[in-house]
Amino acid sequence: MLACTPKVGITGKPKVETSTFEFDYAFGPESTNPDIYTLTTEPLVERCLNGQCGVIFAYGQTGSGKTHTMNGIMDELCESNIFSEGTEVDFTYLEMLGVDIKDCLAADPNPSPKPVAIGEGLDGRILTRNVSVHPCADSSALKALVSKAKSLRSTAATEKNAASSRAHGIGIISCKDVETGIAGKLYVIDLAGSESAKDSKKHDSKRMAETKQINLSLSNLKECIRARTMASEPGKGGIHVPYRRNKLTLLIKDVFEIGCPRICSTVVITNVSPLASDVAHSCNTLKYSGPLRVAVGKGRVNLEKDEEDPANWTVEEAEARITEAWGSEVGNVKAFVGGLSGVQVR
């Protein structure tokens, strides 16, 4: 991708300075929402249906079209093939700013509902509290939930955007195989826009505090992705990924954890403004996004499926393993397992 920056030379004559950035694909003004969905999200959906984890998010300055892009992707997701036979689909939508987390689909109409909490269990699993999970029987049910979540997003007028998203919007789609009990997850994240000092110069104290929280969480997200990208390269061991510093990166821990047994995939969509007045911020966005790309052939080969890990056992395997190890002590193994797979028993 080529970015052209208008400048004035030392002689006073105008000139154009060019910068080149490498990405896997660049979408132009002729690209449609279905085009973007097909190239960026459709492969993640297939992986999610196979019990894997996928994350897609849009990053860029406020007013560059992130929410429009992610709304288009969510609309296409509602019409996708996730509602296949033998698959249970659940949907959750959270809004996050710093340590403050809101469940946009909470049933409690109280203006001060119970606070949402995200933490890490002793076994490494991510645990949530006061988060509602909504079963979706078909695309119409998912559409209704997505529409409700959109209407409850926190927005405010800023210098660049009359309806700027002031928090990260996180849609979580879970697709569980009824037979095995293994659920794949897809996180669709509409990040709040990054803002420069120029963008926020007219903010009041509340907006300034929001901007500080937004930029801090975006900085940590970029640091985690860069570290994880480096760790994917052969010979790059001992790299620390600081996903525990922020609730957003903790929530999608599987994407960043080195050695995670679940196959995870991440897609970063970089949104830039076409305005000449925004070229400095656009170049800065491209500069930070470019290194997040993993070159083809350099990714770390995924770990082989560990047959000894209970998370990989089907219902039948869980019953057989428990019978072999503790059959006489457990008694009725089928009642003990309760039709749960290894990942559920675990």
Q: Model-flagged regions — what are they?
A:
Residues M1-T38:
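Charged, amphipathic alpha-helical linker segments immediately N-terminal to NTP-binding catalytic cores
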Residues E30-P34, N130-C136, N161, K198-L216, ...:
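Flexible beta-alpha connector loops of hexameric P-loop NTPases
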Residues T38-L49:
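Pre-Walker A adenine-sensing motif
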Residues L49-T180, Y243-L250, T266, S273:
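Conserved nucleotide-state-sensing and coupling region of NTP-binding domains
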Residues G65-T67, V99-L105, S196-D199, G235, ...:
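Switch/connector loops and helix/strand junctions flanking conserved nucleotide-binding motifs
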Residues K185-H203:
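Switch II (G3) loop of P-loop NTPases
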Residues N302-G338:
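Sterile Alpha Motif
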Residues F336-R346:
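A short amphipathic alpha-helix within small helical-bundle interaction modules
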